[in-house]
Amino acid sequence: MVSELLLELFSEEIPAFMQKNAEEGYLKIFTKIFEENEIFAKVQVFAGPRRITLHATHVPKVILPKEEEIKGPSIEAPEIAINGFCKAHNVSKLDLSTKLRNNKLYYFFVKKTKERETKEILPKIIIDAINKYSWTKSMFWGCYKIKWIRPLRNILCIFDGEILPLRFGHLSTNNITYGHRLTNNKKLEIIDFENYRNKLLENNVILERLKREEIIKVGLLELANAQNLNIKQDVCLIEEVTGLSEFPIVLLGKIPQKFLELPEEVIVSVMRTHQKYFCLFDKNGSFAPYFLFVINGRFVNTELIIQGNEKVLSARLADALYFYKNDIAKTLESRLDKLKSVIFHTKLGSLKEKVDRITDICRYIAPDNIDLIMAAKLCKSDLVSDMVGEFPDLQGIMGYYYAKHEELNEEVAKAIRDHYKPQGLNDNVPSGNATLLALADKLDSLVGLIIVGETPNGSGDPYALRRQALGIIRIIIENKLEINFINLISFSVSLYKVSSNSHLDSVISFFEERAKFYFKNDYDITLINAVLDLNLVDTKFKLDTLKEFLVQDVGKQLLNAYKRVSNIMGNQKITGLVDASLFSTQYEKELFEVIQKISQQIIVIIANKDYQKALNLLSSLLKPITSFFDNVLVNDSDPKIAQNRLSLLQNTCEVFDKVAKFCRL
């Protein structure tokens, strides 16, 4: 016989961004804990703004007894081990049997479980599962000792058509739930899951998150098409408004024409970030004076709701327009003094000091680039503008528009706009002068914060230094910047007027670790260790070349040849030079001649960055190395000859090391 379990945790508003994770998390937890208790049920979890619901079908009414054979210690084990096994399973030695396993006798114990009624064990299982899910943040409320994401108001729990009694803190289970908070907030008596879902729907609550999401997507598309407009895909915003609404309905509002003089990004920020509205665009991609929004519930007078949302948006845009007009009345340069009163970091001074360092770094990289140096000087000025003070996500973007209003060079304006890029792995790296400005800004922050001890550790990275380092690495590699990065780091460290050596080493070490992290998505770690240095463009080219070379037959054979040499050498460090007069075979002579021939050539080729040619030249060692080992005994009875042969092999390793650290492959 099987039954159905229905559990609803009814609470105050659950943050929208946590609902999807809670749905997935509780599904895993309940499925696992059921299986551990021999309850093999089909489990579903639904998350919404005010409820987390579990529905389990095919739940057995009775857990049948079973036998499990448990292996213990061997019969030859010390008595203390045997007694410990007995104590752990609450049995005596007389209850044990012996069986032969791998030609050895072991004690065994047959553990028998009793038949159990599922309803007797479910309360503990449910409480354990509720407590097991770890919310990103949770809270206590009142004088109760339970904690959850938001205060729980009710717990519905029905098993096999009856209330399953359990207590969670101060709450006892019942068969009651509630409809939509604004339109149908009344008690609903529930019989089973089908009755539960239908009654919620009748009272303006759609249980399934994915169904609510689909309703929103369809509504957005239909209203956009009705206006002959387009809507850009915004997965994150759709997920967010899905989590804000139990019964979503999409409506269309209009933006007054006077606000369209604002930069498009300002209107989008107000609408998307602050109001959770969707922007519309015409067929040419231009911003349209309309917006879409999602309301929570079915209301009679939607026209009044539209007017209310238009009024709220107009008020926000009026503020933005006021800020914008105030800001363009001042130049970016006139704001520099104000940066002196804004702290970048308590130990690293003001934003004005940071701007000065960024400018110095840009001047160091490109001393003749006037546009870059101007952009560096002005890149943080918009941070003290009214607009960015109100809408921080517009930093850089407003600097671009203010620079354009001042009729500054387009390159200066673009560099100011894009110097925060890339912001995350999915963001594009900047181009043009913004490339070097972004590099300088991120490098200054990273160097300064490492100097004052803010290096990330296992518990956190509050200043996102790992992300900034990856941003720098991507900027250099994707823009193929040929710069001496270690010298640049050294210069940046010197701007802080501190004892530089230890700090320089710390910064370099940090970048090396982040470079390994960056490259390991595409390359084996042994390959990375063989070629990594902070000439990042060079490293990328070496990795590509060596990766391709080592999958070829000649590459595999050459690596094996190197390992034969390396295995003989071990950790020995031979100090003597090779003495050709001590050669007693032609194979020693042939190997030595090839080494002498290619050694200097490889240095020149590597300097010219022709790594494929260097590997091809290195391959000329394959035949003489093979012949040497096939015909020569390294440990000759004459110690001088043996030592000379070791020196020859060391020379061989050194030639390989000019191309890559083959010992790490």
UniProtKB/Swiss-Prot annotation:
The keyword Signal does not apply. Tetramer of two alpha and two beta subunits. Transmembrane segments: none annotated. Belongs to the class-II aminoacyl-tRNA synthetase family. Its EC number is 6.1.1.14. GO terms for cellular component: cytosol. GO terms for biological process: arginyl-tRNA aminoacylation; glycyl-tRNA aminoacylation. It catalyses: tRNA(Gly) + glycine + ATP = glycyl-tRNA(Gly) + AMP + diphosphate. This is Glycine--tRNA ligase beta subunit. It holds the Pfam family tRNA_synt_2f. It is an enzyme of class 6 (ligase). It is found in: Cytoplasm. The keyword GTP-binding does not apply. Keywords: Aminoacyl-tRNA synthetase, ATP-binding, Cytoplasm, Ligase, Nucleotide-binding, Protein biosynthesis. Its main location: cytoplasm. One of its GO terms (molecular function) is ATP binding. SUPFAM superfamilies: HD-domain/PDEase-like. The gene is glyS.
